[in-house]
Amino acid sequence: WKEGRPNKPGLLLIGPPGVGKTTVARAVAADMEWQVIELNASDARNAGAIRKAATHASTHGSLFMTPGTKPPRTLILLDEVDHLSGGLREISADRISSIVSGEDFDDSKALKGDSGGKAELLNLLADTRQPVILACNDEMGLWGRTSSTWRTARDRFSKHLITIRFERASNEALRRIALRVIKEEGFTADPGAIDELVNNNPGDLRALVRDLQVMCSLIDSNLTREMVKENIETGVRDTSVEIFPGLDLLYRSRTAQNAMKASRSLD
């Protein structure tokens, strides 16, 4: 994008949860000094919503450009695109335009869920003047796992996308990261404690960091294997923890009794 629009303007990041796909996308945007417009599974991602994101990305640069310079780029980031439902049937251009502009709004004609989202995403990739990154766990969800035309969908998307596959972090990498986090937080840890953390989060860097956040909120100086087992596996703790690490531990509890104990420790 430094030299202009490339032939394939989008990236498709594929990999299991917690390996850093979205983090890498945001880091690229930060390094390139791009703004970010993000749509994830919790947002409406129908044809109108995707068209709005594309329109906003195009106008944002022209609004904030310095005279005599090129307008800044805006990264359009769509996370969890394997959860984008529906086929490739397009919504009429007039209908999308009226939804985007807000003109003649009729709730009965509003697009529901992801209606027309995949087709509009293809249009976005074909016409975009801004970088696009898609992230997913399983590309077959995007192509249409249950559709007999999934190969056609794959080929149509692949014309506009460079695919990058992410792998789960190795145990050795997780150990190095855990030790670094513990050290930078001013604590020490027994080797058995680090092994227990790694074994509880096989290949999942995001989950490891969350567990480390919980552990660092509980220990005074040194982390032991027993402390990890007690708090990660059973959710029992003697002190309160902040709400978000505590909720994560609550959701990971394996029994109702342990979940109740974890909930009582929330700060």
Positions of predicted regions on the chain:
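Short glycine-rich substrate-engagement loop in P-loop NTPases that contacts/grips substrate
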Residues: 36-71, 115
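A short helix-loop-helix "switch/interaction" segment in the helical subdomain of ASCE P-loop NTPases
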Residues: 14, 192-205, 231-237
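Conserved P-loop NTPase "ATPase switch" module shared by AAA+ and STAND
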Residues: 62-113, 126, 138
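Conserved AAA+ ATPase "SRH/arginine-finger" region at the nucleotide-binding site
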Residues: 40-42, 136-137, 144, 161-174
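Short regulatory helix/loop adjacent to the ATP-binding pocket of P-loop NTPases
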Residues: 140-160
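Conserved small helical "lid"/interfacial subdomain of P-loop NTPases
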Residues: 165-193
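C-terminal alpha-helical interaction modules of replication/initiation AAA+ assemblies
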Residues: 133, 141, 148, 207-267
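Walker A/P-loop
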Residues: 3-39
